[in-house]
Amino acid sequence: MAKPVSIEVYNPNGKYRVVSTKPMPGTRWINLLVDQGCRVEICHLKKTILSVEDIIDLIGDKCDGVIGQLTEDWGETLFSALSKAGGKAFSNMAVGYNNVDVEAANKYGIAVGNTPGVLTETTAELAASLSLAAARRIVEADEFMRGGLYEGWLPHLFVGNLLKGQTVGVIGAGRIGSAYARMMVEGFKMNLIYFDLYQSTRLEKFVTAYGQFLKANGEQPVTWKRASSMEEVLREADLISLHPVLDKTTYHLVNKERLAMMKKEAILVNCSRGPVIDEAALVEHLKENPMFRVGLDVFEEEPFMKPGLADTKNAIVVPHIASASKWTREGMATLAALNVLGRVKGYPIWHDPNRVDPFLNENASPPNASPSIVNSKALGLPVSKL
């Protein structure tokens, strides 16, 4: 490997060898693997993304499964190496898997796991946090105070945006987008406009019911509208949060032309995937529109930011921490481990990967199933009837 690596080993005489390319939060995931006869090896290589060659070295001559990260390039080379080592499964410790060549995994008969159903609320909470921080200019104000610049109250000091009664726009009303929308509607009495290829009836019913509640109590009811296009959301919303999947159709979804459609004092939040925004165009837009604000958790070419982004006062940037709550990260580690364990032991696939609470109950043994295998149909794997 390029740098010295320390390998932490649990249950060295275990029957099955499972490798984790990074230390993961909590210990439950380790205990679950060890209790089922696994030798667990954890790679400690801080502040470095493992290369393909590094991971091949970790896989070695015999490896039953690997738990990896979204930052790793899992393509044909790695799946070939894992297959030769007798491996049956790889799982991302992430809900996304755009770092994985699933077709290559299919070719070598390797199951690919992910961790949905555990990070919905925590990701939505960070999107809401970025929304508030941008609206009320919290980061700027914090720097102002720490710099010793505060000399007393002034009527124009860090004037920001009031969210109540404004319109929140959501692009991608899946689990996370809908959770975020509910937080902003119920928490701040914002009206909703959303765009999604599929109608979110459940979200619409929620906003309708909350609007009726407000009206019954003598307050202005909130409203909702399903937009016919993304451009409609961009033009009408005061605050816009992006929650699409990343594919060829959503790459640079927000570009120079679409940024120009937004209100001059709008707020844009992205906790989905970095490449859905043309980051270079965003930097120019921020420079040209000082009242426009953005909150970013993800970036086009992580871990780097486009030149100029770090210098803009109207941008809040955080290092891909949307899922970084203790319960969530430990849950993600557990699901990733159980994905690998399930395939190693020959268990079926859980029938609903979006309902994973039975795997996260620390007071009970998890079901004998892999929580979420994205290529289970392609591999012809059986589904649990539990």
UniProtKB/Swiss-Prot annotation:
Compartments, record wording: Peroxisome
Keywords, alphabetical: Glycolate pathway, NAD, Oxidoreductase, Peroxisome, Photorespiration, Pyruvate
Catalytic residues as annotated in Swiss-Prot or TrEMBL: R273, E302, H320 (proton donor)
Regulation affecting activity: Slightly inhibited by oxalate.
Domain of life: Eukaryota
Phenotype when the gene is knocked out: Very low NADH-dependent hydroxypyruvate reductase activity in leaves. Under short days, slower growth and delayed bolting. Slight accumulation of metabolites with long turnover half-times that become dissimilated during the dark. Perturbated photorespiration-related gas exchange. When associated with HPR2 disruption, strong air-sensitivity and dramatic reduction in photosynthetic performance.
Annotated binding of NAD(+), by residue: R175, I176, C271, S272, R273, D297, H320, I321, A322, S323
Annotated GO biological process: cellular response to light stimulus; cellular response to water deprivation; oxidative photosynthetic carbon pathway
Pathway: Photosynthesis; photorespiration; 3-phospho-D-glycerate from glycine: step 3/4
Keyword Oxidoreductase carried by entry: yes
Short motif Microbody targeting signal, span: 384-386
Gene Ontology cellular-component annotations: apoplast; chloroplast; cytosol; mitochondrion; peroxisome
MF annotations from Gene Ontology: hydroxypyruvate reductase (NADH) activity; mRNA binding; NAD binding; poly(U) RNA binding
Name of the top EC class for this enzyme: oxidoreductase
Family affiliation: Belongs to the D-isomer specific 2-hydroxyacid dehydrogenase family.
Protein name stated in the entry: Glycerate dehydrogenase HPR, peroxisomal
Lineage: Eukaryota, Viridiplantae, Streptophyta, Embryophyta, Tracheophyta
